[in-house]
Amino acid sequence: MMKLIEFELEDVSFIGSGAFKTLKLPELTSEEKFLIDPIVAPTSGLRIQILDQIEKKGKNKLLLTNRKLFLFLRVFKAISQQYKEMKKGKSLKILIVTDNRPTKSILLQYCSQIFAFDGYEIYYQEDEPGESKISAPYGAASVALLEDINLIIVLTASHNELSWNGIKFYIDYPMPMSGDLFKEISNKALNFQEIKFDPSYKPIPIDAEKKNNDYVVSLISKVLEIKSIKNKKLVIWPYLGKARGIVTLFKRLGADIILIDEEINPPNPIKELREDKLKQVMESEGSEIAILLDADRDRIALYVKQNGEYNYYIPNEIYSALHNILAKDYQKKIINVRTIPSDLRGDDTSFINILTGVGYKHLGVILYFLLGIKVDKSKVDKAILYFEDENNNLRKIDNAKPLKRQLFDLIQKNSLFEEEFVIVMWEESGGHTLNILNAVGAHNIDSFRFDSKFPIIADKYPVPALVLITELIARGHEISKSIDWSIKGINRTIPAVDKQKIKIMNNFAKNDNRTILIKDKEYKVSALSDNINTIDIFQLKSNNSTLYFRPSGTGPEVRFYIFGDRETHLEELKVVFNYIKLHYS
């Protein structure tokens, strides 16, 4: 396959001629410091546009400069030092994995050399020589699924354009870094003057992918019997790479897979849809279901033919429909933990609705609360956590007790002492995670908590949901009939660097608890904040629509969301974000 982009490398000058190499680091500029230690905390690791566009001999080319490369090396070294200090230099093992981005090999190589010099055993996913590819969700979950490896680095920039790359890392738990620990690592990365490397490292192969697929098969068997996708022709289009883990899983479950081996930049199925290609492949192969995947497999879309018509579904629609079908048709009790700007069309069928800030650093706190697992105070302080009480009012929480009391009362009221609850944790951008929870000590509030027979994953892990919704579609369920189709949910962005993001949020804060008028339409404004009262999300609610906006944690932009009338939502969203951009930026 022809490469979508190619890039050139600047030469890196190392010192030393023995077994090890040393790199002297230049002083950081202010802009570089912000990239490593951003004002707006990232929702999931760091992402940096690693390739710069330059003009050379009259042609535009992409260049990986030393200064951009060195930012990644600083963060690798900081993670290594932090983990080494936490573990007192013992049991130093790391799994390093990547997606299929053009810069994957150079980052994998240098990352491995840095950790090898610091005394770590280096593990790779079984792959072609010199590669270690696995999906980001599988990489994150491996910290819970692999017995002896408690540090994972995933090199990915998710759905971002291919000139980007990034670092997600997991220590002990499959939950994104946040709070004090993330800050400590950023501070370390800022202060290095040199980094040492061991080029003679020998990675140890391990099949984390199979461990993950075994886990998925075991987990979904507690929700539904997978029977209707057997011998079903499924089209899978990974927008980058070959999605080996997901393809292998569906084949194991009996599906007949047609793989579209054609890459798209940016690798984002929510923004890029090639309907003509999909229809042509589906018609020629006799397939009715196509699965579209982003670069790191945590953002999915579906293209489905039912009743002679093709429909395209985005994550908000997929997950709301899945939850509604499981609740209505299969009598599952859903503990619905969702980010505030995600789809509200599954709320009515849920056992309880719990709303959080955007990202799994918020969602994961709720899971640990329910399981009685201690959560670092700095994580709770930075988390935005609410639940709906019996009157559908949002109650803010900074500890597990009020939420436990609400669930305890609901279980008592409905006599659900033996129920296996399906907890779903999901976000509007595509992340989804589910688990099975059992109530423990449900006759006494003091001993009440939840337990699970499955490993606890508190980061995005959408493959179980993907298998379940595919099975339900194969059984004849229709997404469009399982949610209120008169409502449409979508998001848009306006460009804004960190300082501009903060300015917009600060300027708009004066409208909290007020009603404002935008083009003859009234909106009630509510500010939603974390547990140290930093506002992270604004809600604007009219008589027939709900909008949100917040500073992005993954790029230089402010994100706007709307749930409104299918016919007018796009125009309404455009009016609102133009108004806010004009008056508050």
Regions found by a protein language model. Name each.
Residues 89-100, 233-237, 333-342, 423:
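Short glycine-rich phosphate-binding loop at a beta-alpha junction
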Residues 173-200, 315-349, 462-466:
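Glycine-rich phosphate-binding loop plus the immediately following alpha-helix
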Residues 287-289, 293-295, 303, 309-310, ...:
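Phosphate-binding and adjacent anionic-ligand microenvironments
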Residues 73-95, 220-231:
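Glycine-rich phosphate/diphosphate-binding loops that line cofactor/substrate pockets in enzymes
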Residues 3-40, 49, 163-282, 385-387:
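Gly/Ser/Thr-enriched, mixed-charge loops and adjacent short helices
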Residues 162-190, 300-319, 438-454, 458, ...:
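A short, gly/pro- and small-residue-rich
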Residues 93-164, 246-304, 380-399:
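N-terminal small/polar loop signature for handling phosphorylated ligands or for N-terminal nucleophile
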